[in-house]
Structure formats: C-alpha cells, structure tokens
Amino acid sequence: MLARSGRRTSLIRAIGRAGSSLRAVRTAMLCAAPLLLAAAPSPPTPRLARDTILQHRYGNDADWYRDRIPLFDSSDETLNAVYYYRWQVFRAHQRDLGAKGYISTEFLNDVGWQREPYASLNDATAFHIAEGRWLRDRRFADDYLRFLYLDGGNDRHFSEAIADAAWGRYLVDHDSQAALALLPAMRHVYGLWDDRFDFTKGLYWIEPLLDATEYTVSSIDASGGKDGFRGGDAFRPSINSYQYANALAISRFAALAGDRATAADYAARVERLRGRVLDALWSDRQDHFIDRYKVDDQYVHYWDQIRARELVGYLPWTFGLIGAEPKYDGAWKHILAADQLGGPAGLRTTEPSYQYYMRQYRYDAATGSRECQWNGPIWPFQTTQVLTGLANRLHAGPDGAIGRGDYLRLLRQYAGMHYQGGKLDLEEDYDPATGKPIVGLPRSHHYFHSGFDDLVISGLAGIEPQADDSVVIDPLLPVNDRSRDRLRWFAVQDVPYHGRLLSLFYDADGRHYRGRAGLSVYLDGALVASRAELGKLVVPVPAAPNPVIVRPSAQSISLVRSDYPRPTASSGTDPERLHQGIDGRVWFMPELPNGWESTGATRDEWFAVDFGKPVTLTRAELSFFAGGAFAAPDSYALEYQADGQWRPLPTQRGAPRANATAAVTFQPVRTTAVRLVIRKAPGAQVRLAEIKLF
C-alpha cells in the first residue's frame, strides 16, 4: 500500500513537471508509473449514460440540458435527484432580455421590489453565477455579468458579492478578456459602497433589510422587540465579507490586466478590512463573528455587540477572509449543537435562546400568510453560504471542531429540504423544528435564492478551480468512512474547466463503475491522475480555447407591455397572459402558470406577434406547457404577414412535444408580424409558455 501510494505521488509530480500540453501529461503518466499502469490492462474509461439520465430527469425537455450541464451520480439518490432538479430551477429562472441577453431571476413570477422591467434582483446573484459557471454553455453567466456591470444591473438594491462571483467564474473558464472588460465597472460599483463605509471604524455597515435579511437580531432589538422590518443599522460580517471578497477579486483582476497600482491599492484594502473584521467583529464571549450596532437609540447603543449568535457569522469563511485558523474554529460547534444553530430540520438563522426567536411579526396583507423573517427560520440562502464556508474551511486544513462527515450530513439535510410531500419544490424559508415551509405564498415555489449544484461540484466532489494551469481535487468525504450511510461512489462528468472537459469518478471498491477502485480524474476522456483512497490531488490542466459564445437575439421579446412587439390572440385576451407569451421566460412548473392560455370553444386558435416594424426572421422556438386542462396542440403552422395578408411559412407543420422547447427553422422572411396557428387536442386548451422569433 505504501509503495503504491509513493508511486502515485511520483506520478503526480511527474505530471506537474510535464509542461503545458495534454500530450506531455499523458507521456508523463506512461513514463512515471509503469508499475501502476503496466501490471494489468487499464480499466476502461467510465462513462455515465448521458441520454438515459437526462431523459429520466427531464423527459421531453432533455435537449436543453444535453450539451450544457455536467452529469452527477452517487450512491445517494436524494442528492442525485436534487442535483438535477436544481438545474431545472436554473433553466426556469433564465430570462431572455432580447438584445441584452440572459439574466437569472430570483422569483419565477413578478414581485413588487424587483428591478423593472427586467425582474432582476442582485442579492442572490453570487449564487446564480456560482452555479452557472459550471455550464458548458457559457452564455448564461457571461450575459448576466455583462448585464450587471455593463448595463447597470448591479444597482446595489441589496448588499452583494458580484465581483467575487466574477472571479469564481474566471477560475473555471479562464476567459480573461471577458472578465477584464468588467473591471472598470467593478471598481466604480465598489466605490459607490463608500456610502456604507464608516471611515472612523474602517468597516461597512448596512440595514438588515438591505442585507436581504429583515427581522434580524439587530433590527428587532433596535425597535425594542416591537418590529424589525426596517432599522437596526449594523456593522455586519456579511457586507464586510462581501466587500473583502470583492476587493480581492478586483486586485486579482487588476494584476491580470497588468495594472500594478490598482492591484496594490485593492490588496491594501483587503488587508485593512480583514484586520478590522478580525479585531472588531469577532466576539470572544460568543465565540462567533457578530454584528455591532451602527444605530444608537433608546434600546441599543452604537458599537455594542448584538446579544445572540446568528448564522451570518460564518460568512468570513464563505468569502475566504479566514481559513483553518484555530482561534476561530470553535464557532463551527454552534451549527452542530441542537440547542444553538443546528436545528432538527436545518440550520437556524438565530439561536432559540434569543428572546424573539421565531416570533412572527409580519403577515401577507392579501392572504394573512406569514411573511419572511430571519429570526430563526431556515433559509436556503444562508444554508448555502454556510456550506460554502464549511467547504472552504475543510479544504484549508484538517478536520477540527467540525469535519468532512458533517459536511456530507448537512448537505444531505439541505437536499431533503427540497422535497414537499415527495415532490421537489424549494421554497423561501422553513421551520427549523419541522422542516415545513413557512411563507408558502405563490411566489415561493421553485425559489432561486440559493445554490446547491456548486456545493456538489466544488464541495462534495472537491473540484477547486485554480488561477494557474491546474485543478485541485479534494472531495469532502471522510477517509475510511465505514458508516452505514457512507457515500460509496460518486461521479461528475464533463465539467467545463479551462476550455477542457474534466470528469471525476470515485468508487470505493471499483464495482459500481466496473473500473478503478478509488479516485480517478479524467481530462477530455484520458486518465490523468488517480489514487486508491480519498484524498487531495493536484492535477495539471493545460489550457485550451473556450468554445465561442453564440448569442442569437430573439426579436419577439417584450419587456414593457405597452411597447412593441405586441401580442394578440384569438381568445384568452387577458393582457398579462398575452404578454407572458413573449416576455422571455420559459418554465414548465405547474405550481406557477406562465404563458398565454387559449380559452376558445373551437379547436383552431392563433397567437400573433406584431413587431411594429419590418424585421427579418429565420427561426422560431416554441414552448408548450402540458398538464391539467392543457395539452400540446395536435399541430401548428407559422404564418407571416405580407401585403396585409397572412401567408404560410412552408413546411412548418408538426406536433410539438409537451413541456419542451422546439426549434423551427425556415428561409429568411421579411415581415412586420408572425402568427402561430394552432389546432388544439380534443377537449384540451393550449398554454404557450413562450414563442421566440429570431
């Protein structure tokens, strides 16, 4: 065992010396490890059955995912199911803005506090980018970052860590040109946060509501326990960790651009802010990072510490401000304690010992349902942040107050939260005693205010992207785990990384994947590293050009209802429903209806788009929802307007698949309007989730 381990170490070092080409890596393997590879024929390269998996998970909509998402497999079916569900959530929250490209939304339907007319919010953006960076189709993350920085989408509606997310995305794709185009805007936005910087204390402060966490300890106590929706300005671990990470990202991007002065300036800011967080926001008494009050009133006093621990205290680990320093490691005990932050069903945002723990202050006026609060409920938002921080802590050093087995347990607990009565549907917040949703309003279904797939890829599987031509593989599973519910195997396949495809297989005994026992890493299908047991591997990854991002722009998208393009229909003429047919949003979740719905009694219906000017079109995408009273049409035809008449686009007839997007191509046509003529299935109506015309 030791001899073979030593040969593997020599193999890895030899690969590291091999240079920058994939051929050199393969040559190093053959030369450095003859006893490892020559003793017996090499096992075949394992491959997950892509089409079978995607058909099982997504049915008719499998095509959207086929060349986009990395595959995942493990001995835990709940982790598997939630992993694929979260990509479905990602797909549902992609809103096409037409010429501005794609963004990720937080809510599927509209809410009153979103940024109009885009339906964007910036508080969960870092999660959206962290998930989207792992797609082989780089357009979604790229468009979103361009919107945020080049189109003013980062309006500081809430506190944010978007520059840090851009750096995390760069580590995966190494597209320096795209990243550096955003650098001036990153610096500008960072400077705007001076309006929340106390120069005497050297720290940022924020109102909890604008930290996307209303009804926290600071805001409730600042009201004397009477409210907490507004107020409670405080120096918080959240905004200071965000700004630390954003400054570090800007410093690194500036260095990449060769701007040494800016790199040094922001590096100095990083060190100053880190020092102030460690000096001022760490509480020896509470053994935790805490808020200090900015506000001073009859109930609380400036610079005093808040009186209870909150989950937000783990954010210095989430954003790399600290790693495995022993002084702070005891804080992790609080999420393991059932009477502290470790609730039976999930991580509490505040401890039960707090006087106003789980007291309900706010209700929805229309329904009387409970509204959002952060005084104890489980929030997937902060659960994601804490698990990211825990992954960073465990990757930085050996187990201490908390270990790798805890990461797997907490990830599994979080995965279980995605289920409602056996059905996958992540909502806003949950009761930590029961695991049941609290808010439960229509807007809450399939809520994209958190991450999960990044926790699987970079945390559980341990794919740590690097700034150089390498990748660190360090799965967060305990070595020599013999527990009954251990993860006996897992795989991630076709992960885009530095222009290549990275795959990782772990099989405890080699039986499941019928190949190598232990951990194996493949680059573009070739084995580049392995070891017989779990542990860290540093693998060279010679960079390759990324595929060019293709950006077709749908000319049918309508963001403002009163502007062109404008929809009309033969029935179902409610303005909101009509607009949903061309608003750039496509999803097939039945809990939240989306799209134009026919209401006519006859089988033949139509939906038309008036562009208000001549446009040239060559392609269409049609997305039909099926379920309940709705079915995909029996057939359809596309027509275009010419000389005041509707004329057929030839050969465009067929039976589209339900709950999927179908592409239709045709010879270029110049027109001012297009009409979709539908023959409905007997006894059913049609819901057109979206028609896009290119």
Predicted regions and their residues:
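Bacterial Sec-dependent signal peptides at the C-terminal "C-region" and cleavage site
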Residues: 37-44
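Substrate-binding groove/exosite segments of carbohydrate-active enzymes
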Residues: 48, 53-187, 290, 304-321, ...
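Acidic/His metal-coordination segments adjacent to aromatic residues that form catalytic metal sites
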Residues: 108-111, 141-150, 212-235, 298-300, ...
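Non-catalytic carbohydrate-binding regions of carbohydrate-active enzymes
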Residues: 162, 257-295, 329-499
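Disordered, acidic Ser/Thr/Pro-rich linker "stalks" and the adjacent N-terminal cap
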Residues: 540-614, 623-632, 651-660, 690-694
